[in-house]
């Protein structure tokens, strides 16, 4: 889903019902790939896709591993994005968390992946060492306080929501502008679901490019 959880919320608003990116990912591999035939993935792989987020702990080890790996990835990439956006510096991260988890983007990811592998191998249970898991949870809380609720980050989220919602309304009004291979799907799934599938499959850059192409007059420079 473009723009991550901001995009997820934007699609939920226009659809009038919850949109979950993990359920959409499962829909892609089960129903949309290979012209509707799906990829015929194993149960364990499908549960890894479906269970990487949400309140329920996945019942398979594959799902449990993906769930922790997803959190490792998004927290550290969000830190990297926040640093590049000037919202945060590496030194702003509490010292005791850096002492446990590492002092750099690469260092944290390497440490957490190794800790996940070693702890799971030693205990037979998928997870991080308790002190490391506690530090990860505290780092996540720190990110909510300093980054996710930051006015600069929220303003970018508002822009992302506006882009996706305008794209949605445009394609609902102009279904003939959808890529040709999406059009037959409307006969089976309806226009709303088809437009949602198309937008949900966009990257951030592609969504921005589509918005610029459809709504920004040619020759105007947007800064």
Where are these regions (language model features)?
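Aspartate-rich (DDxxD/NDxxD/DxxxD) Mg2+/diphosphate-binding motifs
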Residues: 1-14, 22
